[in-house]
Amino acid sequence: MEWNGLKMIISTMEPQVSNGPTSNTSNGPSSNSRNCPSPMQTGAATDDSKTNLIVNYLPQNMTQEEFRSLFGSIGEIESCKLVRDKITGTQFEEHFKDLATGTKWKPLTEEGPIFGKGQSLGYGFVNYIDPKDAEKAINTLNGLRLQTKTIKVSYARPSSASIRDANLYVSGLPKTMTQKELEQLFSQYGRIITSRILVDQVTGVSRGVGFIRFDKRIEAEEAIKGLNGQKPSGAAEPITVKFANNPSQKTSQALLSQLYQSPNRRYPGPLHHQAQRFRLDNLLNMAYGVKRFSPITIDGMTSLVGMNIPGHTGTGWCIFVYNLSPDSDESVLWQLFGPFGAVNNVKVIRDFNTNKCKGFGFVTMTNYDEAAMAIASLNGYRLGDRVLQVSFKTNKTHKS
């Protein structure tokens, strides 16, 4: 990756007014993601959270030096860390809570976090000396296009009960409703962090299902009170607005078992795909919500404690993709799974002698709900002359 002259480019760059592309196929945050206001404006941030930033959707091949160079062009940095796969070189879990709650980085000693040369997980943290530089970094770099990614820069919010479980699931939306109209409908109840309308990956037509994440749970509660059972403009039926379920709930585990485990087949392949897709969509509509704010939030991590669901690893949810063509490479997997949410890493398994794809690969996604939705949408998807088989990775899945 070439970064020469980057500082000069950044210094002349106009502040970004959008957090990402408007296309539904972009590999990065959706365009509805808000520019995070200054903590001085909201009055809700602590002193520490005025300088700590989380950066999502970074190119996988971006180095620590490039990451520091990019954000160092804004102002003096106290610490800057690109998070890497702990299995391939990084140990950060013991120190994660210090970062997420806005406290200062621990020194890089033998007892501190080791940021080695493992595979990048696509996100990192920056802690500035001056809060004004942190604010400038958000205004300048949020929405910046790097390779195929559009990065998202926001304050690393402290863990608090008031900001947990603020995700809403909305169904029964008019098929003609746009993302902007969805936001306009809900914005009267509070600050929207992210929103999303699910579309059919083949036709591009809305599925009538959307997700809204508010800044605070109380705002989400007010939206449920005000809009659940109401008919928005253009709707033939009342919409349903409810909290997106936590994947650790028993109902979700039971539904997941129905979705992805079959006594007769090793993989949930494309047979009777249209009927299966209808069943998958209905089950997912009952159980799952998409979390789009951050790849690592305290509530997101604690919700995974004690779970025993196929595909869960220490770095996210591993998805097995089968029946890829010999010419497939990692970019194919990025393009397929990127629109569904935060992708930590992708890997195409290649033949040692020919370096051609052996027909399968793996994708690790940060959020369970996004991974489940990607599987439901892409299992049975026709890619060229092949029909993909997509499922959560299990112990019986092909070894890499």
Swiss-Prot record:
Residues 51-158, 166-246, 317-395 form the RRM domain. Residues 12-48 are annotated as: Disordered. It is found in: Cytoplasm; Perikaryon; Cell projection, Axon; Cell projection, Dendrite. The keyword Repeat applies. Residues 34-44 have a biased composition (Polar residues). Residues 18-33 have a biased composition (Low complexity). The keyword Repeat applies. It holds the Pfam family RRM_1. SMART domains: RRM. RNA-binding protein that is involved in the post-transcriptional regulation of mRNAs. Plays a role in the regulation of mRNA stability, alternative splicing and translation. Binds to AU-rich element (ARE) sequences in the 3' untranslated region (3'UTR) of target mRNAs. Mainly plays a role in neuron-specific RNA processing. This is ELAV-like protein 4.
